[in-house]
Amino acid sequence: VAGAITTFTRLHQQAGLSFDEAIRLIEVSKSTGYRYQSGKSELKGPALKLLQEAAAARIAETPGWFRFIDLFAGIGGLRKGFEHIGGRCVFTSEWDANSQKTYRNNFPDNHPIGGDIRQYSENPDLIPTHNVLLAGFPCQPFSLAGVSKKNSLGRKHGFLDETQGTLFFDTAQIIAHHRPAAFVLENVKNLESHDGGKTFKTIMKVLREDLGYHVQSRVISSEPWVPQKRQRIFIVGFREPTDFDFSAVQVPSARNGPKLGSILEKDVDPKYTLSKKLWEYLQNYKKKHEAAGNGFGCSVFGPNDVTRTLSQRYYKDGSEILVAQPGSRPRRLTPRECARLMGFEEVDGTPFILKDVSDTQLYRQFGNAVVVPVVKFVAASIMPYLIQALSAETDDCETPRQRAANG
């Protein structure tokens, strides 16, 4: 298969090693490593054995009571939420190399990270069987999707024509082939109004009418769990009818939600403080826009505040969320604070590993991520109905109820 993962890449990913760490382990040059990586040279002998042993040592031991796949995985926010209720990830797809590094550092796996999802939607048998599909696919207008006049002859033929060329199409292809018991899709709130509402309408039509799933959606804000105003839409689908009612799920009140001070580090490197030049520029830029009646501008937050939405552009100047420093210029959030703001770690919990990539890349990754406690909430909300759905399935998964019955 074009673009298929080589043995070298698969094993060093399974072992949780970067390219450089892998070639140091097997004691070969970079040029030899690149040949292994591209498939031009065959990995064999002692080098193969060393990587196999390293990969075997890192295989996750917990089987999980259901199997899920993680598409457009980013740095694993959806995964963390569904591992929380006892799921086991059996396949990951993420094209960005830096996100792959962060993901690999934080998830000990016995499977590699697939790159371009199109090779898997074209050959869905490459994806293992699973009960749940998770996907945070990018938002794209279907009005721009390429439709072949020769094939359509002026008529629509379901999602193959309506969504061709978009990443939702690849997701739909995989759902259509594997028919998982359930799926959870995540996107920005504006998906509902994107392209005049056409995008969301088409997605729901494809999922309900073309794929035959029972689908509901809901926008949930992150404020009850983290000190950030971040709204995201979650689309939940079950293959068979259930009593799940997304609109009836009780979301905690944001009134008693955490404040910014709860996630701030005590000792912060001065490099995160804005330069005098940048701070003056941002202040002048804000005044200019306010005079013109625009709302754009930098925002400074104190320890008792809840921030705006962290975006992937945060690395540029940090203007959307600046931390007040009495007696000094404000500062950016640190990457560690971004991890906490997105719920990837708790202050006294297990640290989220932030190595091998630059601050710029980490800001982008967290700005594109989901808020983990929100995903945990969604996962816990559908868990009883997922157990119900899987009780009729005849795979190797054992639900918590079955596990208890079996002693």
Listing of model-derived features with the role each one plays in the protein:
Residues V1-A15:
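A short, Lys/Arg-rich alpha-helix, primarily the initiator
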Residues Q14-R24:
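Short, charged amphipathic recognition helices of the HTH superfamily
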Residues E21-A22, S29-T32, K277-G407:
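C-terminal target-recognition/interaction regions appended to catalytic cores
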Residues E27-E42:
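Recognition helix of helix-turn-helix/homeodomain-like DNA-binding domains
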Residues G45-A60:
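DNA major-groove recognition helix of helix-turn-helix/homeodomain DNA-binding modules
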Residues A56-R179, K189-S193, K198:
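Core alpha/beta nucleotide-donor-binding catalytic domains of modification enzymes
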Residues N123-H130, F142-T309, R313-Y315:
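Class I S-adenosyl-L-methionine
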